[in-house]
Each structure stands twice: as structure tokens, then as C-alpha cells.
Amino acid sequence: MSTPENRPVSFFSLFRRGQHYSKTWPTDKRLAPVFIENRVIRATRFAIRIMPPVAVFTLCWQIALGGQLGPAVATALFALSMPMQGLWWLGKRSVTPLPPGTLNWFYEVRTKLQEAGQALAPVEGKPDYQALADTLKRAFKQLDKTFLDDL
């Protein structure tokens, strides 16, 4: 699922990619010190669940109390934009090419999967974070939990 480096990704497809990336990324505690994805995914899921009711409550409260509608609408729009910001960041991260250190680690995990007898599709172009998420998800399913200790 790597994208070629020279092809731009549309604004709205970043949201879809962010949602897919959040579902693909393994939420293992041992990955948290190295990757920020666990925290961003948790915050985004929380915002998706909580911010729409907060926006509705803000509007209803201001209307019921006879307050000004402008600040209430601005607050509601801000609350509704928070989950979108998380999904956009995750989508942008999913198409970001891996840095050299993480790239070496990515190939080591792929090698471990191949040594375990797993058939892997060849990597197209420069691997990105989505390819890393797919590989890690498969490694957590197919390999024992100690594969991270050796790396």
C-alpha cells in the first residue's frame, strides 16, 4: 500500500488513509516509546466519540441561555475539527517515507517473517509508515511476542 513518492495524495483521501492506518497500527505497549501513533490513535478515537456531543451541548447551552451564537458556533466547529485533525495527521503519517533507522528495522522484521515461512509481497518503492503498520500487524499475528526483543 505504498504510494509513489512523486504522486501527491488528495486532501480527502488523507482522512480515509488515516482511518485505515489507525485500524492497521498494532497498539502494543512496547511500541509506544518509539512511535507516537498509539497516543495519537487513542486521542483521535476519543475525539471521534466525545467531540460531536460536546459541540451539540455547546450550541444548545448558548441558545438556551440566550448567549451569543457566534462564539458558540466557533467553539462547536473547533470541537468538531479535533477528530479531523487526528485523522489528517494519521493519514499524512501513513504516506510518510520511513527514516533510515526505522527502515532498517522494517527490513529486519520482514526478514524475520520470511524466516518464519510467511510469504510477503515485494516492497514497491520506498516503504512508508503504512507498510510498517501492515508488517507489524502481521508480525504480531504470526510471530511470537518476543520478536521485538531481538531487534
UniProtKB/Swiss-Prot annotation:
<dbReference type="GO" id="GO:0005886">
    <property type="term" value="C:plasma membrane"/>
</dbReference>
<keyword id="KW-0812">Transmembrane</keyword>
<keyword id="KW-0997">Cell inner membrane</keyword>
<dbReference type="Pfam" id="PF04217">
    <property type="entry name" value="DUF412"/>
</dbReference>
<dbReference type="InterPro" id="IPR007334">
    <property type="entry name" value="UPF0208"/>
</dbReference>
<feature type="transmembrane region" description="Helical">
    <location>
        <begin position="69"/>
        <end position="91"/>
    </location>
</feature>
<keyword id="KW-0472">Membrane</keyword>
<keyword id="KW-1133">Transmembrane helix</keyword>
<protein>
    <recommendedName>
        <fullName>UPF0208 membrane protein ESA_00924</fullName>
    </recommendedName>
</protein>
<feature type="transmembrane region" description="Helical">
    <location>
        <begin position="46"/>
        <end position="65"/>
    </location>
</feature>
<keyword id="KW-1003">Cell membrane</keyword>
<comment type="similarity">
    <text>Belongs to the UPF0208 family.</text>
</comment>
